[in-house]
Amino acid sequence: MLNKTAITFLFIPICVTAFSQYKKYNFQQAKMGSPFNIVIYSIDSIKAEKAAVATFKMIDTLNEIYSDYLPESELNMLCRKSGTGAWVKVSATLFSILQKACYAGASSFGSFDITMSPVIRLWRTARREKKLPDEDSVFAAKQRTGYQFIQFDKVQKRVRLQKPDMQLDLGGIAKGETAQKAYIRLCHLGFPFSLIDAGGDIVAGDVPAGLNGWRVAINLPETEDLMNQRLLLRKKAVTTSGDIYQYLDINGVRYSHIINPVTGQAITNLRNVTVISDNGTNADWLTKACSILPIKKALQLIKKFQSTEVQIAVLENDKPRFFRSPGFTSYFEKTEVE
């Protein structure tokens, strides 16, 4: 699913001492509706390319499991059994991400819910037709939702969707999970000095000796302008959610592509949320949850996760105001002036 985010990484070396024989190689392919970038520091260009190709193939395999667009994806095959009472044997890969998603729902005060696809599809149509969805249609769609109605058989790795016509959408977690798995794959292939950019969900790995980390830039709310500060990351994941690309503007009100599971309505706050975490999965879904929750609750949510930080940027009188967890600024790149 296309889910562009207001974040980018910069191909700029932080330090070139002891750079030795390592060179940087960039590989890009379109995956999951977004450009996927794989950046590898390597002493062997041929081996780096082979590793990237193998990783892109793995991403294709994951897409065949996670996609809500591919009719025969494993996810959609599961959804066809919803409401029948049948337990469905699923792959360990799908079982794992569904468990993580339901944990996210329970941990986030219900602000993250992968069963919201019926409502999300109404809002996709609304953005395309440039008109708000009918309230009765939203209400009817919400009757088919609720992550609490996903049941798990942990022994036999089976899943049951209790409500009829349930449709799952992993768009708020799958790219972060995929980026994390892609980085792990590259490490197994011998390339820990690498970065994955899954359409804005970034997993920044290790770097060669002589480099301090990967530089990541963040957009300000409602604009393509970048913050003056850059993040400097190493062995961390980062994702930013905002509505700079996907939104519906009606009578001067901007409706985001992010839907509040409680109300079924698109959020209208002018907010960018950036989450730094130890893994891409948490960074991905936490940005969505923190975009929906009141700022105080969002900061409370982040406290539940070790080594995780958040920045919430809001517009007040056309100027950005920042709310941050205590450790967020420690990831800002230090300048000579500082």
Task: Provide a role label for each language-model segment.
Residues 11-19:
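Hydrophobic h-region of N-terminal signal peptides that target proteins for export
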Residues 2-6, 19-338:
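Mature catalytic core of soluble alpha/beta enzymes
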